[in-house]
């Protein structure tokens, strides 16, 4: 599964993030369910038995496996694959009206994947090399679309597919170059979907809210830095 995170630098100096990936769904509706899956997938002779037990106690996970299989297809380019937000957010208008939405980044270049034979023998970093060459010819663009929830679509379960077909393009994300120097001079880069701006409200999705805690722990292990008040409140 591949991902794309975007950090918007706002005029007042604050930032807001979106996080997307190639899978349209998460494998679990709760953090504990995801941890249970990781434990069941630990290598060993008892893994098949552990996985069978997991699926018996988490039957909805079966529906996520075909989605994950599709998400693992090898793209011809990072620029020819779609990325999807797992979580819903409540968008609130100036007049107080509100709708729940999920995010999608759709490649302007259209989706294009490689067959197994075409991908065979490619260098491990061929996607990065391809993107660099593509950027030499101009920006890479994605349409920023939101899917508006229908009456039966869950705003708090990232493992549940939405039935709504109401999709609106709200902007364009443009990539103009590669940033090869990250986290220098004490600058710690964190893309946290709980970091929102005015008019966007996180839902009570437990996986969404757990991500801030997970990212804070990751930063502390990786850099020794405590995010402290910089981390969004959960």
Model-derived segments and spans:
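Active-site-adjacent core segments of small-molecule enzymes
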Residues: 1-234
